Amino acid sequence: MRDIFSFFEKPKDPLSFSAIRISLASPEKIREWSHGEVKKPETINYRTFKPERDGLFCAKIFGPVKDYECNCGKYKRMKHRGIVCEKCGVEVIQSKVRRERLGHISLATPVAHIWFLKSLPSRIGNMLDITLKDLEKVLYCEAYIVIDPKETGLMRGDLLSEERYLQLLDEYGDDKFSAGMGGEAILEMLKQVDVHGLAELLRTEMRAATSEAKRKKLAKRLKVVEAFRESGNRPEWMMLTVIPVLPPDLRPLVPLDGGRFATSDLNDLYRRVINRNNRLKRLLELNAPEIIIRNERRMLQEAVDALFDNGRRGKTITGPNKRPLKSLSDMLKGKQGRFRQNLLGKRVDYSGRSVIVVGPTLRLHQCGLPKKMALELFKPFIYNKLEERGYVNTIKSAKKMVEKERPEVWDILEEVISEHPVLLNRAPTLHRLGIQAFEPVLIEGKAIQLHPLVCAAFNADFDGDQMAVHVPLSVEAQMEARVLMMSTNNILSPASGKPIINPTQDIVLGLYYATRERKFEKGSYRADTLAFGEDGVAQGYLRGIYASLEEVRMAYDNGEVALHAGIRVRVPIIDDDGNPQLDEFGHVKRRIVETTVGRVIISEVLPKGVAFEYANKTLDKKALSALIDVCYRIHRNKETVLLADRLRTLGFDHAMRAGISICMDHMVIPPAKKVLLGEAQKEVERVVEQYQEGLITDGERYNKIVDIWASIADQVTTEMMAGIGKETVVDHETGKESIEPSFNPIYIMADSGARGSTQQIRQLAAMRGLMAKPSGEIIETPITANFREGLSVLQYFISTHGARKGLADTALKTANSGYLTRRLVDVAQDAVISEFDCGTLDGIRVAKLEEAGEVIQPLGDRILGRVALEDVVDPLTGEVLITANTELDEQAVRSIEDAGIEEVVIRSVLTCQLRRGVCALCYGRDLARGYRVNIGEAVGIIAAQSIGEPGTQLTMRTFHIGGTAARGKIEASYLEARTEGTVRLRRAVVQKKKDGTMVVMNRHGEIVVVDETGREREHNRLVYGAILKKADGERTKPGELLAEWDQFATPILTEVSGVVKFGDLIEGVSVQDRLDEVTGLSRKVVIESKAADVRPRISLKDPESGKTLKLPNSELEARYLLPVGAHIVAQEGDLIEAGEVIAKIPRDTTKVQDITGGLPRVAELFEARKPKDHAIISEIDGEVTFGKDTKGKRKVIITPYSPDGHALGDQAREYLIPKGKHIQVQPGDRVRAGDPLQDGPPNPHDILRVKGEKELSAWLVNEIQQVYRLQGVGINDKHIEVIVRQMLRRVRVREVGDTNFLVDEQVEKHIFEKENETVLERGGKPAIAEALLLGITKASLSTESFISASSFQETTKVLTEAAINGKTDDLRGLKENVIMGRLIPAGTGLPAYKRLQVVVEGEPVAQAPYVAPRPRPEETLTAVNEE
């Protein structure tokens, strides 16, 4: 009886284990797993199709082919369960055991496991201290190895050639030493290894080692030896004497028709191993000659290598069709491997897909599901209901009934579907909003209807996109779909916290049209219509003024007033929190506002508490977004959803009524275009003339011409927009004319944000402008025509470059972006909110973000939704505005900005002290929900998606412009004041020339504008060589010029007046006369010289004595070394004054900056790569001096100063800067730690070393944000911080102390801290480590979980490493749990929630609300633990 029960028992629940361990298998273990030895290479009998005995498919070893039936057919049926047939030896049992029973092959000679041999570093090699090359020689039978030298004077592990071996045998005899070749020799040596002794020996050697290289080598060996010591693995297990054989159903052999077979490659590989093994056994029995046996051994080793990892060593073994055979390693690796194909991505049942069409009448939580599709998807539910209702008695008849599509079936389908959410998904699913839940509504036809407002989240359009539908089956799944995934609960974007259900396209157009005002319409407000009679009684009435909003509606419905008429109306006054203001009698206060009829109609759909002001403006896309945002902040979910739906209906309705269409005449070409083009042409000619006279270089000419055309194109565009955007309106009553914003359809579309941009209209009606070559440079002759005038053949040809490049880029970059997302997800997957508060006392300082004096992001935007670390105090009154550890919500941010606070210290993920995961307070607000984050939220994955998703968007965005060269940020060449105040110079050295111009002579100067109270209003860095327009202490007004400079070249200025003398400027060696073909003029350019002692320079001599002049305030001489590529401006023998330019270093010509620069840049930052030609930065604060040059490199010395002003010479640091690089500092400059000494991009690892983790993370966040900002993509800083936190998880051990670490070992921070705590408790000396920045790929591969790392990249390497260390995976991350088939430990799968018991009392509720109630942040969940 018990057998019957055990037969029906469920498979092992994945929850029943808590960790998984990987280690090496000993030969005994393999034999223990095995159900028998495979002795023959035969598979199945090709006539009977029965497996051959002792072959690869043997039924005796692996189990029966048919359920409960032995091979010879003596025992059939269930009643003989568990009997072993005496005739054919097959156990009578279910055939599925053929999926789990292993066999084995006993090898005639030990072979090396290729993973431990070839996977670098070679573990066997490390264990025995033999190089891989020598090891292979021994294993592949090409040399002998000394196993035990005894008293011969040889060394253990020496290689001997054949002749030498024979010679030694003659000399000593075979009992005086032992040597061997092949697997046996290596196995013997590994057996002799004493792991503990070896570890001790290596540690002693390391202490004694002098050279760094030797220490590193010993540390590597020690690592492997330690791994074996701690894991309990034996070194000899890296050699195989027994090989396990995979269960046959995992490497099937399927007969095809026509007597052929389809087979798994593994069978071929096993067959080779068995054949060679049997042959070797036979040869050994026959005592064959040594050379034949050697050859056979080598072949066996090669066969086993191919089975484990084909192609790793030697030639790849190919099948009959010249295709490489897939080995066991290939089964795991890559996108098609076991991990990514079957464990991380599975196909699901109960799903369908179809084309989507727009559903303009759906509510936000609905989607239209075709009837036929629904019938198929909900079949089991329908069968169940049909039986319940008694329509049918069996499933079979239910099936028939459904197939006939009887009317009862449709009624039941309606019932089953109501309140049962389905999931819609559109590929590619780039962020979590790519899958959302909707309630299905049955529709005719075959296409799925989708609500237009969720298109932005899915990135869907209706040009043929397809979407998939999935049905959540269990009650729990349905509940999660409804509460967490319903489209109505995903109103805000998790990336930025802004609404994502913004109206787009027609809806925007309709609402914009409805809320525009048109002068002199029927029923407009007119102040001049009121006349008084002689008795002072009013005659007539005031037109266009209304007592209430309802009155306006009535007038409009009766045709008294037009939609666009400007009117006045009384409205209630509402405060910021959405409450109406009352007067002393308790009545609502009202006021009269100017508005239009359309705006009043729109205001009718606003929820109570949203002020009329939000509807009382022309509603373009931005205003609508703001309106939804405000509605969400005041009313939360339900009202916002209703508002969005109402706006959708109104928008479509008005767009239809407006009947907007476009034609050629709407593209008005500005009359000024001709004039402007003429002017530009003249300017270009002027520049060319300057070039021909030799005043400017070819590069400068190119830059200037491109600049001229870029600005002319902008001017023509401005003219055109002005022309399209304005029209003349005539008042029919008085005949007066007035110029008003126009209703030109093209203008309306762009202005409202519905479709198109200034960029595109400019191509239609102004000029196409500059285009880019395929190489990315800008062609200097622009396309002056526009599409209305039509392009000439040449112009059309130039245009095609851009268009083609756009398409090519898109294809390439989509892949890149997807890969970036994958790496980000992998590195951040285990960042989960695991506790409420970590109790940290550390945080980061945040101030407003400025660039080139312009505020890019105000302080409020940066701190919204974060948590304050300490009390925020008003600087003037000293009153505490916000207490520590409070979330900074909209109101708090407003009070901080009103108080004029410049910077706030907030808690950040970067400084969170939790060892695993992140705490809720350090993370702050959950952007997608708008309140504090819940415990269990998978913030790492959200961060990865938020960063990766726009990457793909951006890559796809390039080709819409059609390749018009949108020049990236052209660097500014001047600085204007933005506020009124007094100019102050800080740390700036200024030289006044004879003509009165002031030149900035140093690099770290700043110019500040202060107001009356002495508060700093703005401050900017001054560029070296800039010409100041305002002196220190001068007053300035907004818009006045403070300084200007040349943005195309960096000058080298002289600090003293004197005669120019060239040094080492030898024609053809260090300087070249670049002759300009066009102008015939030459210009000296410094080139790289081969000689080490040549140092091109310019010195300044005293005109009288001829001696080299000294620099001001120093003993150094006025010599200026010239970097490679510098253009020399001064002539030898000229008398020049201080502050003049003697040479220029040209900057690169501007290339088009689109996200091409962007994506690789983001990847480069996240991978923490060293940029090429990176800047050398100073590690300390101090004063600069120059030392003697060494090996053609310049020596810069920085000497620190003590607080009382003494130079600390013994702590000085020296830096060598390569010749030909431009040094940014001058002798005598004071530099701070982290300042660059030469130009070039900074190296993130240097920043970390010099300035620490906080500075580095601030820099990284800013650099990454810059790329996204350029594209107008908003991502919250905290997402990037989460990723940076994961990159900074590890430390590098510098000194080991009394811990078990090795020098230079990389360990997780929390393991390091834990180990140190243990050592300190014992009274030992702790280890010292330095922070380490890992790129995201490196960081993912070095996670604690080997399952997660191996499913990411380099599978074999990770598994090899893990097996040797005997690693245990505690299944803490998300990925490991998905692979093991468990619930992920995040969200509702959090261990804390698993123990929750839900008790239901009373009757079930008939109707569940479709909007999920949101847990208030105040109410904390109390868990009921089951005891």
Curated annotation (Swiss-Prot):
UniProt GO cellular component terms: DNA-directed RNA polymerase complex
SMART domains listed in its UniProt record: RPOLA_N (SM00663)
Enzyme category, top tier: transferase
Cofactor note: Binds 1 Mg(2+) ion per subunit.
Enzymatic reactions: RNA(n) + a ribonucleoside 5'-triphosphate = RNA(n+1) + diphosphate
UniProt: Mg(2+) binding residues: 461, 463, 465
Cofactor: Mg(2+); Zn(2+)
Matches recorded under Pfam families: RNA_pol_Rpb1_1, RNA_pol_Rpb1_2, RNA_pol_Rpb1_3, RNA_pol_Rpb1_4, RNA_pol_Rpb1_5
Keyword hit for RNA-binding: no
GO molecular function, one term: DNA binding
Top-rank lineage group of the source organism: Bacteria
Binding site for Zn(2+) 2: 838, 912, 919, 922
Binding positions for Zn(2+) 1 per the UniProt entry: 70, 72, 85, 88
Gene3D superfamilies: 1.10.132.30, 1.10.150.390, 1.10.1790.20, 1.10.40.90, 2.40.40.20, 2.40.50.100, RNA polymerase II, clamp domain, RNA polymerase Rpb1, domain 3
Keyword terms of this UniProt record: DNA-directed RNA polymerase, Magnesium, Metal-binding, Nucleotidyltransferase, Transcription, Transferase, Zinc
Family the entry assigns: Belongs to the RNA polymerase beta' chain family.
Oligomer status and interactors: The RNAP catalytic core consists of 2 alpha, 1 beta, 1 beta' and 1 omega subunit. When a sigma factor is associated with the core the holoenzyme is formed, which can initiate transcription.
Name of this chain's protein: DNA-directed RNA polymerase subunit beta'
Species in which this protein is naturally found: Sorangium cellulosum (strain So ce56)
The gene coding this protein: rpoC
